[in-house]
Amino acid sequence: MSDGKKHVVIIGGGITGLAAAFYMEKEIKEKNLPLELTLVEASPRVGGKIQTVKKDGYIIERGPDSFLERKKSAPQLVKDLGLEHLLVNNATGQSYVLVNRTLHPMPKGAVMGIPTKIAPFVSTGLFSLSGKARAAMDFILPASKTKDDQSLGEFFRRRVGDEVVENLIEPLLSGIYAGDIDKLSLMSTFPQFYQTEQKHRSLILGMKKTRPQGSGQQLTAKKQGQFQTLSTGLQTLVEEIEKQLKLTKVYKGTKVTKLSHSGSCYSLELDNGVTLDADSVIVTAPHKAAAGMLSELPAISHLKNMHSTSVANVALGFPEGSVQMEHEGTGFVISRNSDFAITACTWTNKKWPHAAPEGKTLLRAYVGKAGDESIVDLSDNDIINIVLEDLKKVMNINGEPEMTCVTRWHESMPQYHVGHKQRIKELREALASAYPGVYMTGASFEGVGIPDCIDQGKAAVSDALTYLFS
C-alpha cells in the first residue's frame, strides 16, 4: 500500500458498512493508524434500506422507521454524529391485533406476546376459553430438554399452545423478520426466551420476574415510547455519516465481482474494471452478493442456500376527516389466519406526529410474507387498491388518498432458519482459515435491526484492527 499504509476495503454501504467506515475513521484519527480505507457500494446511493422520502409535507420512511432506544449503539451513533438534537421518541398509544375482522387491544403486560400480567390475559377477547386454559399449562409444564436450536413455532406452541401463538405471538414475531415462525430459529432471533424457560421453567413466570419495570405495555401511560427516530427522517443519519467520511474513498454504483488471494493480501475485482488490493476486507453486502464474491469457499454454500423474503410497504396520506377510526391507537398487526393481504398497519401520524402535516392522516401498511410474496410484484395501483380494500374493512375511509408512496424490497429480509447460528459459525471458521483478515457481517448474520447492524459493523472494525496491528 502507499507510504507503507495498510488498506481496508469495506464492501457494502448499508448501515453496517457505513458504521464500520465511520468508526474505523475514528480509530485512525484517534490512534494515528497508518491505514487507508475504501468503501464499495453496488447501488447508486449508500444507506441500504434506510431511505426517507419527503412528499407534500409528509415524511415517509421507505425502510425502517426507528430503532429501540435501549439498544445503545444507535442513539450513540446519532450523538457521535452530532445529531442528538434531532432525536424524537414515538408517541405512545394502544396497539392492536386484528383477528378475522376484529381489532383486539394488545393485552397489557404482554412482552412479545408472552403475558406477564394475568388479569389482562384472562379478560382479552383474543383467545377462547380453551386457548387461555392451554396457555395456562405453561405454569406446570417442565422446561424443554436442552437443544442446540428449534423453531420459534415449536418452542412457543409447546409452552402456550397454538391459539396464543397464531393470534398474538406469530403476528408480532414474524412481522420483524417477515418469516415463518415454524422455520425461524429461536436461538438466532430470541434466545432469551429459551434461556428464561431453562432458568425459570415457566416462560410466563420467568418473563414476569425478568421483565424490567416500566417496560412494554406500561409505557402506554407515558407520552414517550421506547423507539427513536430523527425528526428529519432516518436518511439524515446516512447523509451525515457520508458527509463526515473524510478519509474514506467511496465507490458508488460499483460491484465487487470477485475477492481472491493476492500474495500476502487480497485482490478485489470491481465491475468498473478497477482492481483493489487490500490487507483486510469487511464484507457487509447482502448474503447472496457476498456468496458470489467467494464462490470457491465450500462453506459459502450456507449463504447461497439462505432464503430472503420480498416485502413492500405503502404510505397513504389523507385529509384528517377522510379517515375515521373506531379505535384510538398507533396501529395493528394481523393474524395470519385472517383474510387480509396486509400484515400490519401503522397509524403513522399518531405514532410519529412530526411525519404528517397538521390536519393530515398518514397510514403505512405492509404486505408480503413468507410463502405469500407475489403481491410485491403487482403494479403500484394494484397494491394500493388491495391495501385500501383491506383498510376499509377496519376503518371508515372516504375518498381517495391525496398522497401515495409504494416501496418494494425484493429478497430483502434474510431468513434465520433453524440451525442459522451454527451455519454462520461454520462459515466464519472456514473464512478465518482460508481468508484470514476477511470478515462477513451485517443483517444476514446476527440481527436485522439498525442497532444490531451498527454493533456488527463496530465488531468487524475491532476484528480487522486486531488482525492488522496486533
UniProtKB/Swiss-Prot annotation:
GO biological process, one term: heme biosynthetic process
Binding site for FAD: 12-17, 41-42, 49, 63-66, 256, 409, 448-450
Functional pH dependence: Optimum pH is 8.7 (for protoporphyrinogen oxidation).
UniProt pathway annotation: Porphyrin-containing compound metabolism; protoheme biosynthesis
CC cofactor: FAD
Segment forming the signal sequence: none
Effect of residue 227 to R: Decreased affinity for protoporphyrinogen-IX
Main subcellular localisation: cytoplasm
Catalysed reaction, written as an equation: coproporphyrinogen III + 3 O2 = coproporphyrin III + 3 H2O2
Gene Ontology, cellular component aspect: cytoplasm; plasma membrane
Subcellular location per the Swiss-Prot or TrEMBL entry: Cytoplasm; Cell membrane
Zinc among keywords: no
Null allele phenotype: Mutations cause the accumulation of coproporphyrinogen III or coproporphyrin III in the growth medium and the accumulation of trace amounts of other porphyrinogens or porphyrins intracellularly.
One MF term in the entry's GO annotations: oxidoreductase activity
Entries under NCBIfam families matching the protein: PRK11883.1-5, proto_IX_ox
Record function comment: Involved in coproporphyrin-dependent heme b biosynthesis. Catalyzes the oxidation of coproporphyrinogen III to coproporphyrin III. Can also oxidize protoporphyrinogen IX to protoporphyrin-IX. The specific activity for the oxidation of coproporphyrinogen III is much higher than that for the oxidation of protoporphyrinogen IX. Can also oxidize mesoporphyrinogen IX, but not uroporphyrinogen III.
Record family assignment: Belongs to the protoporphyrinogen/coproporphyrinogen oxidase family. Coproporphyrinogen III oxidase subfamily.
Name the UniProt record assigns to this protein: Coproporphyrinogen III oxidase
UniProt gene name: cgoX
